[in-house]
Each structure stands twice: as structure tokens, then as C-alpha cells.
Amino acid sequence: MVKLIESKEAFQEALAAAGDKLVVVDFSATWCGPCKMIKPFFHSLCDKYSNVVFLEVDVDDCQDVAADCEVKCMPTFQFYKKGQKVGEFSGANKEKLEATITEFA
């Protein structure tokens, strides 16, 4: 299940709760066409990779989280391990998204 992050505190808690698991964060917006396009694929990955934590951040609802994470465009995917960012890319690239998950998971 993809967890919707609604505050800076919830984001920090989710990263901490993940422990050693890979955390994949989808920074998106409701008005973003490419975000809508990749969203079902992103959600399908959480069934395929049960050992990975999937988070979703709406940049309009959580501007502080997006600013802290230096998100400049949507969609941006960030990858965290043990609370530290280990990877990031922007764009609705399904192949790159899954390849990056398999690289870090």
C-alpha cells in the first residue's frame, strides 16, 4: 500500500519506521499530467516489492516537505535508506523507476 504523507512530521516518522527497508517517495501534484500517468504503475509496484516502503507526497498539500527535499519538478522520485537519500530522478520513466528500486532494494 502506498502511504500518503500529509505533513513534515509524518514524512520523518515514515522514514524512521522503515528501518533498513528502501523507501521510495513519489512527489507529485494533482494537476500534473505525467504524475497521473505513472501513478497506477507506482501503486502496482508496492504489490511487487513487498519489502519496500512506498510514500506519496502531494507537493501542493506538503510544500514544506517538497521544499526540504529540494523537489523542483514533478514527478520526482526519491529513494531513501536508513533515513538518508540514496537516489533521485525526475520524470515519469517507468523503466528507470523499477530499475532504481531493484538496484537499492
From Swiss-Prot:
Q: Does the keyword Electron transport apply?
A: yes
Q: List the disulfide bonds.
A: 32-35
Tell me which UniProt keywords the record has, alphabetically.
Acetylation, Activator, Cytoplasm, Disulfide bond, Electron transport, Nucleus, Redox-active center, S-nitrosylation, Secreted, Transcription, Transcription regulation, Transport
- Localization, UniProt: Nucleus; Cytoplasm; Secreted
InterPro entries attached to this UniProt entry: Thioredoxin, Thioredoxin-like_sf, Thioredoxin_CS, Thioredoxin_domain
Query: Which residues are annotated as active site?
Result: 32, 35
Q: Which residues carry this modification: N6-acetyllysine?
A: 3, 39, 94
Q: What is its main location?
A: nucleus
Q: Which residues does the record list as S-nitrosocysteine (modified residue)?
A: 62, 69, 73
Keyword hit for Acetylation:
yes
Q: Which residues form a coiled coil?
A: none
What Gene Ontology terms for biological process does this UniProt record contain? cell redox homeostasis; cellular detoxification of hydrogen peroxide; cellular response to antibiotic; cellular response to glucose stimulus; cellular response to hyperoxia; cellular response to xenobiotic stimulus; negative regulation of protein export from nucleus; negative regulation of transcription by RNA polymerase II
**A Pfam family assignment:** Thioredoxin
- Gene Ontology MF: a single term: protein-disulfide reductase activity
Q: Which SUPFAM superfamilies match?
A: Thioredoxin-like
The Thioredoxin domain, residue ranges = 2-105
Family affiliation: Belongs to the thioredoxin family.
Can you name this protein?
Thioredoxin
